[in-house]
Amino acid sequence: AFAGVLADADIKAALAGCAAAESFNYKTFFKFFAIIDQDHSGFIEEEELKALSDAETK
């Protein structure tokens, strides 16, 4: 779903960066949130989640 937005290496690095316990980074979260929240409503609607694969939403 992010093939046109992010490189595969960037996606893998992001997933690895948050795999450890207590590794939450709010700045990174909000960058990701801004990409997913396509209508800038402040919420991620079901339609916006449809752009993600099943693996990305688990």
UniProtKB/Swiss-Prot annotation:
The lineage of its organism: Eukaryota, Metazoa, Chordata, Craniata, Vertebrata. The keyword Acetylation applies. Keywords: Acetylation, Allergen, Calcium, Metal-binding, Muscle protein. In muscle, parvalbumin is thought to be involved in relaxation after contraction. It binds two calcium ions. This is Parvalbumin beta 3. Ca(2+) binds at residues 37, 39, 41, 43, 48. Belongs to the parvalbumin family. InterPro entries: EF-hand-dom_pair, EF_Hand_1_Ca_BS, Parvalbumin. Ca(2+) 1 binds at residue 45. Is regarded as an important allergen. Residues 24-58 form the EF-hand domain.
